[in-house]
Amino acid sequence: MSVNRIQLSGKDILEKDFKTGIRGYSQEEVDEFLDVIIQDYDNFKQEIDRLKAENEKLKKSTPAVEQSRSRSQQPPTSQVNYDVLKRLSNLEKAVFGKRYTEQEES
């Protein structure tokens, strides 16, 4: 909902006067209904203000969250080095182990 599209405020609704006719609406019923509408408007305004504040807070915290997330996704360098060395060792065993057994059979 865009702020530019809001046409009434709680005060506008409260101050609205309706013309009465011979068989018009019950003024008491209209007043009660308008009171409910005013309460809703006030509640919506409070909710919008709360959500705007929460939105600003989240916008400010987003860079910090992204930085901590990127740090947590990267494994420690020592772990990466260990994994690479283990793979290299297994590869050497596979390559040189086959050559060694082939030489013994000949």
Swiss-Prot record:
What's in the keyword line of the UniProt record?
Answer: Cell cycle, Cell division, Cell shape, Coiled coil, Cytoplasm
Q: Give me the ranges of the annotated region Disordered.
A: 55-83
Q: Which GO terms describe its cellular component?
A: cytoplasm
Question: What residue spans carry the Low complexity bias annotation?
Answer: 70-79
Location, primary (coarse class)? cytoplasm
One biological process term from GO is:
cell division
Where in or outside the cell it occurs: the entry states:
Cytoplasm
Q: Which residues form a coiled coil?
A: 34-67
Q: Its domain of life?
A: Bacteria
- What family does this belong to? Belongs to the GpsB family.
Role, per record: Divisome component that associates with the complex late in its assembly, after the Z-ring is formed, and is dependent on DivIC and PBP2B for its recruitment to the divisome. Together with EzrA, is a key component of the system that regulates PBP1 localization during cell cycle progression. Its main role could be the removal of PBP1 from the cell pole after pole maturation is completed. Also contributes to the recruitment of PBP1 to the division complex. Not essential for septum formation.
Q: Which proteins does it associate with, and in what oligomeric form?
A: Forms polymers through the coiled coil domains. Interacts with PBP1, MreC and EzrA.
What's the name of the protein?
Answer: Cell cycle protein GpsB
Cite the source lineage: Bacteria, Bacillati, Bacillota, Bacilli, Bacillales
